[in-house]
UniProtKB/Swiss-Prot annotation:
It catalyses: 5-[(5-phospho-1-deoxy-D-ribulos-1-ylimino)methylamino]-1-(5-phospho-beta-D-ribosyl)imidazole-4-carboxamide + L-glutamine = D-erythro-1-(imidazol-4-yl)glycerol 3-phosphate + 5-amino-1-(5-phospho-beta-D-ribosyl)imidazole-4-carboxamide + L-glutamate + H(+). Its main location: cytoplasm. Pathway: Amino-acid biosynthesis; L-histidine biosynthesis; L-histidine from 5-phospho-alpha-D-ribose 1-diphosphate: step 5/9. This is Imidazole glycerol phosphate synthase subunit HisF. It comes from the Bacteria. It comes from Staphylococcus aureus (strain JH9). One of its GO terms (cellular component) is cytoplasm. GO terms for molecular function: imidazoleglycerol-phosphate synthase activity; lyase activity. GO terms for biological process: L-histidine biosynthetic process. Keywords: Amino-acid biosynthesis, Cytoplasm, Histidine biosynthesis, Lyase.
Length: 252
């Protein structure tokens, strides 16, 4: 039995960790290196850094953050945000990232997934999907630019395409659930998992440990992402894991 993972997510803007609700209203959380070390020691299975900086200076700061963090971590580090090319991926991996997460650039140029997978191995390539449910069209669509722009690409079509192109993992954020702490989008995540064979990290809505139990009981996703509840110290990684174990679910 593959053990489930709990993964803290740190949105980094201009060298600081920030958090919003439904991708809006960002507030400062703290120093990314300090937080990464804290989560490493607190029992996190992996870490995700998403660089949401708008400037080149911000992206350069991110490389420093990755280098300082990676040398002190004993768990895998995935980095996403602003990645446009194979050179960008090379730079991130050389600075200490274990995996990279592609989003807008992959939607713009799907062949980047294949090129990256061929060059670095599919185990390094995670595709992040910001999924928005459009009630008028009654379908989930992929969004780009940090959730600000909706495309005409349907999520259920896209997940199958990226798997064929060589993605090794999916990071699916349900935008309507992000930061709301009301539970994961179970039905949506279960549908995606039925369409692909690669691991899925679920993001958006984890408000308490029971939400993670429901996630793992009702879907076959591999991991749950947590941000708000951990950053605000409402709970800890170990507390979440303990409740998951009590629910009879194998967790790392």
């Amino acid at each position: 039995m593959i053990k489930k993972r709990i993964i803290p997510c740190l949105d980094v803007k201009d060298g600081r960790v920030v958090k919003g609700i439904q991708f809006k209203g960002l507030r400062d959380i703290g120093n990314p290196v300090d937080l990464a070390i804290y989560y490493n020691e607190a029992g996190a299975d992996e870490l995700v850094f998403l660089d949401i900086s708008k400037t080149e200076e911000g992206h350069s700061l991110m490389l420093e953050v990755i280098e300082q963090t990676a040398s002190r971590l004993f768990i895998p580090l995935t980095v996403g945000g602003g990645i446009q090319s194979l050179d960008d991926i090379t730079q991130l991996l050389n600075h200490g990232a274990d995996k990279v997460s592609l989003n807008s650039s992959a939607l713009k140029n799907p062949q980047l997934i294949k090129q990256a997978s061929d060059k670095f191995g599919r185990q390094c390539i995670c595709i992040a999907i910001d999924s928005y449910y459009d009630p008028e069209r009654k379908a989930h669509y992929c969004c780009t630019h940090g959730g600000k722009k909706m495309t005409n690409i349907k999520v259920y079509d896209w997940v199958q395409q990226v798997e064929q192109l060589g993605a090794g993992e999916l990071l699916v954020t349900s935008m309507g659930h992000d930061g709301m702490k009301q539970g994961f989008d179970i039905e949506h995540l279960a549908k995606i998992k039925s369409l692909v064979n690669i691991p899925i990290i679920a993001s958006g809505g984890g408000g308490n440990a029971q939400h993670f139990v429901e996630l793992f009981n009702q879907t076959d996703v591999s991991a749950g992402l947590a941000a708000s509840i951990l950053h605000d110290r409402e709970t800890t990684v170990q507390s979440i894991k303990e409740v998951i174990r009590q629910g009879g679910i194998a967790v790392r």
